[in-house]
Curated annotation (Swiss-Prot):
Similarity remark: Belongs to the Cu-Zn superoxide dismutase family.
Record-annotated membrane-spanning stretches: none
Subcellular locations according to the entry: Virion; Host cytoplasm
Gene that produces this protein: OPG175
A cellular-component GO term for this protein: virion component
Keywords: Disulfide bond, Host cytoplasm, Virion
The name this protein goes by in its record: Cu-Zn superoxide dismutase-like protein OPG175
One BP term from GO: superoxide metabolic process
Organism: Vaccinia virus (strain Western Reserve) (VACV)
Stated role: Superoxide dismutase-like protein with no enzymatic activity.
Gene3D superfamilies, sorted: Superoxide dismutase, copper/zinc binding domain (2.60.40.200)
Top-level taxonomic group: Viruses
Length: 125
């Protein structure tokens, strides 16, 4: 299993790459974006020393996520990505080819756990 922590300005989230019932899934949640559709993209390098400017070229389009009116996206996507090949690379959240936030994909400790999704109610809490 792999995990990517996103924490850039007000954009925060946790994205997991893991096998679920024999298929690889991308699971997690992101908060802090404006309502709309965004892309999850794996990039060549896991170098975030200069923010999302140093992560290299896009390599793999994972899929689109939808951010609701409260600024929350719940991620549940199928993927054909071999998880072992993306460790150490970067994942970006992008819109119209602009990288808005990114993080490095790392190995996650494998244990039985429940994925806790970031939630927000109608009052923004």
């Amino acid at each position: 299993m792999a995990v990517c922590i996103i924490d850039h300005d007000n954009i925060r989230g946790v994205i997991y790459f893991e096998p679920v019932h024999g298929k690889d899934k991308v699971l997690g949640s992101v908060i802090g974006l404006k309502s709309g559709t965004y892309s999850l993209i794996i990039h060549r390098y896991g170098d975030i020393s200069q923010g999302c400017d140093s992560i290299g070229s896009p390599e793999i389009f994972i899929g689109n996520i939808f951010v609701n009116r409260y600024g929350v996206a719940y991620v549940y996507l199928d993927t054909d990505v071999n998880i072992s090949t993306i460790i150490g690379k970067a994942l970006s959240i992008s819109k119209n080819d602009q990288r808005l936030a990114c993080g490095v994909i790392g190995i996650s400790y494998i244990n039985e756990k429940i994925i806790h999704f970031l939630t927000i109610n109608e009052n923004g809490v």
